[in-house]
């Protein structure tokens, strides 16, 4: 245990090293590592005037698994509208990264209490060469029960989790997003004493100020994923005088760290992209399309911390894709480093991307584009195409919005499908030579345009008539990829047959037609017999 704390303190001193050297140069002793379970600290000379040109850094480190509650007893710094002169900055973690900044403060109004989302918090005090005030005095403690949480993401646990929580506890947390953003709360473990009305031990989640619109949860069934009505979510945990449980663990996400996308196509990126993403975040992006669709994601840029050099696995910062709306869905892929992954496609209408970062080393992050893919069955003969699309996938659309080559070749509704049957000499088909093979090609259009906004999806339909093999490929032109079009030109190339079959939905494969071979053989045989007959006649 002592060795672990020693290593932790060495790490803290290394992180604070540059700040401590700067303070020594100014001749002012301040800052340091605070590792006791609780304590107090203040600006230099407090309560007298603090010195000019001073910068102090405090790193508060408590036992792992705990959190830090920071409160202020006194506060008096030079005032400025943007706190550009003298100021106090509070960071959620060890790194003074903008993404971890909980707030910058000056003037005479004390900052509110702050709770870290893990066991480390940083405080930086800065004064310039003009105007000094009395400074500040603050206190901290570990293992807090409740508090105000303001980071992009973090973890929330019951007291002493995963051990049983104490009796007669009452904890209040306020999770507050910046600006107009919402807060998302996801429970990953839950075991609280239960009864039918949750009147003994419970977790209550309130969507706004006051005890209104609240939901109470108890027992061992995890609560559903909850999203705030506004920019704030309140969580209350209460236990009675007997019978406990393991408690709960939940992740919260806010702002650009949690989004739900429901448009047919779009782009998004990691927080602060293309600048470095913050440390210690866990972000969710959910793509949710109407039933019947699949989601295809293209990676336009990826720059994360490199894999573990020993295990060669993504043990540190990583981006994961799940085939559904939660982390319990099948994993489609897990990536780190800077090599672009291939596109991934969901099997149904939802896909989740998760970004996890640790306490050190940040990079540029990622940028992706996605599009809703319509599963379809395409087959062909030596003379025509047949395309079948389930009406469930295109329920909001009229059949005339689905057409091959031109609007005159619109789909017909047959049973539960939209069907297009088109000869190779109609509907904009053309013959091309690809990989020394003759193929017939046309373009299938699905028009989602509405309210004056054009949105037409294009699929290349391809047939090799001699083998009666058909395939379909998503055509993604650069017009929908925004500023990343130059990096996504490869999307316009059709994938090989097996990739198209795996990623673009079912493709009908028909056995090779041997009638042409038989016909050619008969012609050759007839020619040989004719030559033999002529020779015999000449000999006679």
UniProtKB/Swiss-Prot annotation:
SUPFAM superfamilies the UniProt entry points to = Spermadhesin, CUB domain (SSF49854)
Q: Give the subcellular location.
A: Membrane
Q: Which residues cross the membrane?
A: 517-537
Keywords, in A-Z order: Disulfide bond, Glycoprotein, Membrane, Repeat, Signal, Transmembrane, Transmembrane helix
Q: Which residues lie on this side of the membrane: Cytoplasmic?
A: 538-540
* Database matches in InterPro entries: CUB_dom, Sperma_CUB_dom_sf, ZP-N
What is the residue range of the signal peptide feature? 1-22
Cystine crosslinks: 30-56, 83-106, 145-171, 198-218, 257-283, 314-336
Which residues of this chain are annotated as glycosylation sites? 40, 267, 377, 435-436
Q: Identify the PROSITE patterns for this entry.
A: CUB
Which parts of the chain does the record assign to the membrane side Extracellular? 23-516
Native source species: Homo sapiens (Human)
Q: What is this protein called?
A: CUB domain-containing protein 2
- Membrane topology annotation: Single-pass type I membrane protein
The record ties this protein, via CDD domains, to: CUB
Q: Name one GO cellular component term.
A: membrane
Q: Where is the CUB domain?
A: 30-143, 145-255, 257-373
């Amino acid at each position: 245990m002592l060795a672990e704390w020693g290593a932790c303190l060495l790490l803290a001193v290394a992180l604070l090293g540059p700040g401590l050297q700067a303070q020594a140069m100014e001749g002012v002793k301040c800052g340091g590592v605070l590792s006791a379970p609780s304590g107090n600290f203040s600006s230099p000379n407090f309560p007298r005037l603090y010195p000019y040109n001073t910068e102090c850094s405090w790193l508060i480190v408590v036992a792992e698994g705990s959190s830090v509650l920071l409160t202020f007893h006194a506060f008096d710094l030079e005032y400025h509208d943007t706190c550009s002169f003298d100021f106090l900055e509070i960071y959620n973690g060890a790194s003074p990264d903008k993404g971890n900044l909980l707030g910058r403060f000056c003037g005479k109004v004390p900052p509110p209490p702050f709770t870290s989302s893990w066991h480390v918090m940083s405080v930086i005090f800065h004064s310039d060469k003009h105007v000094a005030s009395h400074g500040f005095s603050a206190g901290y403690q570990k293992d807090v029960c409740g508090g105000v949480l303001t980071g992009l993401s973090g973890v929330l646990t019951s007291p002493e989790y995963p051990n049983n929580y104490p009796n007669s506890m009452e904890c209040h947390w306020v999770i507050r997003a910046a600006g107009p953003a919402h807060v998302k709360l996801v429970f990953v473990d839950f075991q609280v004493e239960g009864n039918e009305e949750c009147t003994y031990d419970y977790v209550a989640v309130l969507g706004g100020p006051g005890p209104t619109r609240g939901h109470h949860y108890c027992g061992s069934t995890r609560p559903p994923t909850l999203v705030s009505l506004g920019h704030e979510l309140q969580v209350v945990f209460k236990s009675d005088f007997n019978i406990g449980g393991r408690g709960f663990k939940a992740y919260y996400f806010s702002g650009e760290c949690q989004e739900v996308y429901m448009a047919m196509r779009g782009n998004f990126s990691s927080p602060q992209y293309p600048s470095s993403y913050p440390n210690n975040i866990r972000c969710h992006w959910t793509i949710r399309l109407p039933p019947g669709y699949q989601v295809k994601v293209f990676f336009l840029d990826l720059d994360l911390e490199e894999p573990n050099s020993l295990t060669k696995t993504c043990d540190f910062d990583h981006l994961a894709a799940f085939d559904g709306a939660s982390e319990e869905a099948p994993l489609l892929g897990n990536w780190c480093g800077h090599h672009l992954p291939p596109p991934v496609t969901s099997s149904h209408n939802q896909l989740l991307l998760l970004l996890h970062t640790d306490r050190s080393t940040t990079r540029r992050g990622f940028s992706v584009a996605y599009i809703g893919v319509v599963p379809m069955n395409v087959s062909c003969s030596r003379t025509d195409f047949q395309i079948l699309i389930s009406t469930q996938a295109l329920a909001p659309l009229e059949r005339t919005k689905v057409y091959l080559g031109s609007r005159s070749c619109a789909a017909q509704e047959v049973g539960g499908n939209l069907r297009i049957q088109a000869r190779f000499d109609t509907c904009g088909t053309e013959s091309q030579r690809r990989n020394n093979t003759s193929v017939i090609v046309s373009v299938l259009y699905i028009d989602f345009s509405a309210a004056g906004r054009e949105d037409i999806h294009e699929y290349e339909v391809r047939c090799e008539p001699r083998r009666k093999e058909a395939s379909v490929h998503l055509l993604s032109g650069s017009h929908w990829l925004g500023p990343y079009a130059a990096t996504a030109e490869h999307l316009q190339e059709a994938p090989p047959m097996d990739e198209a079959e795996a990623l673009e939905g079912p493709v009908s494969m028909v056995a090779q037609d041997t009638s042409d071979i038989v016909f050619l053989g008969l012609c050759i045989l007839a020619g040989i017999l004719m030559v033999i007959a002529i020779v015999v006649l000449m000999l006679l």
